């Protein structure tokens, strides 16, 4: 589930895990998430904190910002104006 700036994506994703808990999600049914990103990567910076970026079809790796792990749902990462959950 991705919520960002008024758009949402709730559907199946390809989930790829990297070292240290960093992960990337890519939508399966459509080319992009609602906000135009082809993939979203949550880079772990330290325990409970991450930097989130979205890759656009034009190849721009846009910085979404800092996120913290949700206390209510540990599958979710919450930023200032976005939430990324990987179930």
Question: Where on the chain are the PLM-derived regions?
Answer:
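Cysteine-centric segments in proteins
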Residues: 1-87
């Amino acid at each position: 589930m991705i919520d960002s700036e008024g758009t949402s994506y709730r559907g199946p994703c390809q989930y790829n895990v990297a070292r240290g808990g960093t992960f990337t999600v890519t939508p399966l049914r459509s080319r992009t998430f609602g906000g135009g990103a082809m993939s979203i990567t949550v880079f772990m910076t330290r325990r409970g904190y991450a930097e989130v970026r979205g890759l656009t079809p034009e190849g721009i790796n846009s910085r979404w910002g800092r996120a913290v792990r949700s206390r209510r749902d540990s599958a979710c990462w919450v930023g200032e104006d976005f939430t990324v959950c990987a179930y």
